[in-house]
């Protein structure tokens, strides 16, 4: 049985494991992140799991089944955070998975397949500009070149961050997860307002939108702000402002299937009040459940950037960061989750996920499913992020039910 008090205690403990600042601050590979991961390791060990840490820092806890040679039933999420984030994004998935395993142990539940609980490293893109890096590493999608290419705001490369944690950098191109996987399940807060608006307790995810991310650097002339007439300026920030508004407008025009566009990074050089901005770096994030729609919007945006730059006498460069592909959830997994929801007896709806998740990297060749619980007012990536413990417990019960069924050899996903 899922124990509310035990689960609540874990959330309280994780809330204390943060760097100074408002909300939760566990950026990937920082000391706070490492302390959070150590707590997860301790929880896994206390739950009787056999813990392994791979060469990228992903934490895997195994509850061995009666037939260890069968493909593993994988479940997990992440515990790193954005700056000034909340205590539920990702954490719900990891702690609920551990609690589900405890529940099985408490009940003496016997299962055929080994269950693997995973705390994926560096799911958030906040530090290195690319998301779900731990999952990508486990799927063989990261190269040594990527480790050097991805750099944080302090100039620290992903390579150096891994090296500082004594992880095996030379293994990165050979660390693809080798064990066969029967299924992958992730439970997560919705990070939107739909469930709350529809008064539904659970969302059964049908597909995951995926981002294309790139940096745009616009260059003009950093001239004197007082001595340069308006008609002789090449102001990079004014050009960037036009581009930002253009991205909003172009994304809004694509209604079905919808595309969302965000400029979440704006860096101005030299950043002085008496100097016309000479360069601006924009971080652009374009997402959709449809790759075709997303690609169309990205093409229009790049054409628009070219028009603005030429019109204003500016130059620009575009640096790709990530190009993930949207995925659909496995129909058999959707059915298993729906059956579990019905057995618990709560209202649910099927829905796509607008945010990316670790689950998307398993969905191509592993039957994958996701469960959403509501978060208050849809707020996430924010200190005000909140999920009600009643909803967390309900989600954990559903996850427990799903994992028990999947861990039986008699359950076929076809």
Where are these regions (language model features)?
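Midchain, well-structured core segments that form catalytic/ion-binding scaffolds
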Residues: 122-123, 129-291
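A non-catalytic alpha/beta surface segment that caps or lines the substrate-entry region
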Residues: 19-64
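Zn-dependent metallopeptidase/amidohydrolase metal-coordination segment
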Residues: 7-17, 76-77, 348-398
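Active-site metal-coordination/substrate-binding segment of hydrolases
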Residues: 41-45, 50, 60-163, 389-394
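His/Asp/Glu-rich mid-to-C-terminal helical/loop segments that flank catalytic regions of hydrolases
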Residues: 208, 224, 228-253, 298, ...
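N-terminal hydrophobic or amphipathic helices/low-complexity stretches enriched
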Residues: 1-24, 64, 275-276
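A short beta-alpha structural unit
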Residues: 27-29, 262-271, 283-289, 315-334, ...
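Alpha-helical metal-binding/catalytic segments enriched in His/Glu/Asp
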Residues: 75, 84-124, 212-218, 224, ...
